[in-house]
Amino acid sequence: MAGLERLSAAHAILLATQLCASGNVAGLQQLQSRFPTTLNLERLLRIILTFLPESTEPQRYTSVLQALADGTPAESPGEDIDVSPVQNLPEAVARKRVRKLHLLPLRYRDGEEDDGSTDPLTQFLVHRAHRIDTETGLQTLVLDLLLPFYQRSETLRTWLISVLLPLLRLNYEYYPNREETMSMEVLESMDDKRAVNVLLSMANPGKDNTDLVKNLRGLVGPWMYGSGRPKRRKLSLAARRNSISTSQDDTISHRTNASGWHEVNEWLLSRSQVDYDRVVGAFANWNGPEDVDLGGYEKENETLPGDEGATLRKRYGQAGLAVVYANPDTSKRALEGSFQVISSVAKLLELEEHLVTVTGPSLPDLSFDMDSISSTSKASLLQNALLTPSNPLTSPTSQSVSFLSALLLSLRTLGELGHSISCKAAANICLHSSDETQLLELRNVVETMAKHGRTGLDWRKVREQLLWLRDWRGKPPAEENVQSREYHGLFWRVSRDVVETEVLKAMLAVRGMSILQKENCAGTNPLQNINWPWTSIRNRKLLP
């Protein structure tokens, strides 16, 4: 301490820079205790920021930072600080050198952490973290720097979770073999839409879909934790203003982090057009915005207020229904994937009781409220309208879940008849087609079946399936309330007699009249117990 007493304020500042440059930060606390005014906390942090090499292991100086920030008195030193580098400098020379130091500011450029309430230590740590990343690329050192401090600052904790955690997972855990690592500056420069696209597009194409789920939970989830940061809000707002098509969800995106999660829903919908299996896997294995992994730095179940969590959960469920409607693939695999999606959505939103299921050999009798569904226009099925919160087809309700699952069961039934169409096409037939169009589509189904007809075809089952497709009923009621059955079934505008007629015409085309008569005489006709509407059929001049 004796050597320090002979130093001026200028000498003390220069000595502090020397200690930092040599990595000997242990003496800074002792030096500050001798010059508390000259080496106040802000100036000392700026000296450390400017002169301490970024490659220095944080464990060597984090305890000093804590002591300086807390104002802890320096312990009695075991040995005096070496003042020889500065003690012989004339005062004028020392002052001149101090004026030329050009200390870095505590606040990182373009950083929003300086909001008037952020303490100097937090500003220092954020700036120091960026310098470590820029100069060394060792983001693990940044984690070592922040771990002792993140719990004392909400700003710092948010920054660690939303910026550093996704980068550590991306660069070191999930994709360590990538040629280029992503920097903090690059990630922080992204708006919500770009970040979601980059982080989710990292998923490697493969046989399973765990990569996408992992990225949703472990990359996008933490990123969204920082949606309230001023810089993020500014970037995302500017991106929305510059976008040709504005968000369908502007009412909520400006006041919560729903804007970012809306981009996730948009990405899933868009991605499903080219990689349906992977998106199906996401809905089957990820439970939406509340299903995130924040690395233990924050309790996941406390990140979203109740109302906001429920809203985001519903919007995610809507994205699931939208994905099903938008899927153009008519394969059996895609259809089974659609069943997976709607089942997962119904389970997540506690709407499972409204799913249409087959529990026995017969197709179920269905009846549910269609008022909101029947009022939709063709525009409701356009891709840019599927995520609109007010869309009755995709907004998750008991009606929308029942209707869509009925459509999917209809598609499965059509597939068994050899006629495959998309979910969107089925919805249009049911909701927006005239009686002529529905009849034409029915004939297409029958013709397809007849064209590929087999001798052993079970016509009784075929008839039951087509009649069920008409009105989603297993058996005809004693008295049918036409109004209550509107929009129930793909061919609800076509009369039951016409459906019966079309089935019989197809059967005759496949089996031939002579075979039918022969089997009738022999008593082996498999259709002998079917109550055909013969009078109506004769009136149509199909039989003599």
What are these regions (language model features)?
Residues 3-57:
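Charged, amphipathic alpha-helical stretches
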Residues 22-26, 37, 41-42, 54-62, ...:
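Extended alpha-helical scaffold segments
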